[in-house]
Amino acid sequence: MRIVKGDKVKYLNLEGVAISNPYMYITDMETYIDVYFSEVREIMTVKINSLKKVN
């Protein structure tokens, strides 16, 4: 599933397990992307393959 700007995503830990909360939203698209980390209300940059799309 392709991740695009505006998608709701979950962060995957080192074992590839999705961390359920909080949800994050894509704000920019590149190899490294900026996501809005809702619980702490800040933007953080993560690798795109560390994210899983939420339906």
Enumerate the language-model features and the residues they cover.
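Basic/aromatic-rich interaction segments and small domains that mediate binding to polyanionic partners
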Residues: R2-N55
